[in-house]
């Protein structure tokens, strides 16, 4: 999957470049080679995303070290005006030396994405968070905010998504079916019966009180200024799209399910000629798989 993600990053970078405006000469980006920043060090921004603001691109991503996949530094930020030459802006969101904090050093912090809120003038970061020492059990969404694009960002909270809320695309008949589902009847995974139950909302019901799981994720701001949180949920079996509040710092409770039981992650979304397109990968760990789009 790392090769796949690298290819996607190169493709997205190329697309953004052709849509941008810059008269600066560009140096070639050579696939497979170390990509240095302005200090000559490799760009350390894994699982990242690029935000364009006031003529500058900002690349946010996970700082990774050689010894662990856990977050020992936090979220890095790099800036560029041409998408080839990147300046290290430093740590945008730091993990902390406090084990009582959700973002304690050693937690798992992945897929940071940043959007700008024109109403508040704030920059808002969302990310996938797993609590220190808990593996991938927490499946939380974290949020932080800053007055400037590169940060520093102030951590606000983390948690599951839309606790106590059913998807808005579940009609009365679907809710009636949901009421009949009992997890004890589907303890064996990957059977046709289990898959059908997941499709009908088995895990939505299981997680209703505590909130929906949120792992691989992205953000999208529509033309009307409404922002959406798109994430892999329900044990990575179903994608969900959740509406964010006007300040982009919380969820409104409105969300829909996409490709139930489809087993997709790593979502990316864009709009072209009035149609929304979503690209995802399958769930095969670090092994490559075919892209899907809808």
Regions from the language model: what does each represent?
Residues 87-93, 154-161, 252-259:
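Beta-propeller fold detector
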Residues 76, 83, 87-118, 129:
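Blade-loop segments of beta-propeller domains
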Residues 74-76, 141-144, 240:
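A short loop-to-beta-strand structural motif that recurs across blades of beta-propeller domains
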Residues 293-294:
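Conserved small/polar residues in nucleotide/adenosyl-binding loops
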Residues 46-70, 90, 110-136, 143-144, ...:
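Hydrophobic core segments of beta-strands in well-ordered, beta-rich domains
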Residues 39-41, 104-105, 208-210, 257-262:
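Surface loop/turn motifs at the tips and blade-to-blade linkers of beta-strand repeat domains
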Residues 19-20:
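C-terminal motif of bacterial Sec signal peptides marking the signal peptidase cleavage site
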Residues 128-221:
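Asp-box/WD-like beta-propeller blade repeats and closely related beta-sheet repeat scaffolds
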């Amino acid at each position: 999957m790392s090769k796949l993600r690298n290819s996607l990053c190169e493709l997205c970078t190329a697309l953004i470049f052709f849509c941008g405006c810059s008269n600066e000469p560009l140096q070639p980006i050579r696939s497979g080679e170390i990509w240095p920043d302005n200090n000559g060090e490799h760009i350390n921004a894994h699982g990242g995303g690029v935000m364009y603001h006031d003529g500058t691109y900002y690349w946010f991503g996970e700082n990774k070290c050689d010894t662990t996949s856990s977050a020992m530094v936090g979220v890095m930020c790099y800036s560029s005006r041409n998408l080839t030459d990147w300046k290290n802006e430093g740590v945008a969101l730091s993990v902390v030396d406090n084990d009582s904090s959700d973002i304690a050093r050693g937690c798992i912090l992945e897929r940071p994405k940043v959007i700008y809120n024109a109403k508040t003038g704030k920059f808002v970061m969302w990310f996938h968070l797993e609590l220190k020492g808990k593996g991938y059990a927490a499946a939380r969404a974290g949020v932080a905010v800053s007055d400037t694009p590169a940060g520093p960002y102030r951590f606000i909270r983390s948690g599951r998504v839309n606790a106590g809320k059913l998807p808005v695309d579940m009609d009365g008949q679907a809710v009636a079916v949901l009421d009949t589902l009992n997890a004890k009847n589907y303890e064996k995974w990957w059977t046709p019966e289990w898959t059908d139950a997941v499709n009908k909302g088995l895990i939505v019901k299981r997680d209703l009180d505590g909130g929906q799981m949120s792992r691989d994720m992205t953000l999208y701001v529509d033309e009307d200024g409404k922002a959406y949180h798109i994430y892999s949920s329900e044990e990575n079996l179903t994608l969900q799209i959740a509406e964010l509040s006007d300040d982009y710092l919380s969820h409104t409770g409105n969300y829909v399910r996409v490709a139930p039981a489809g087993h997709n992650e790593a979502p990316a979304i864009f709009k072209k000629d009035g149609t929304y397109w979503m690209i995802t990968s399958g769930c095969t760990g670090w092994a490559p798989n075919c892209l899907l789009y809808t």
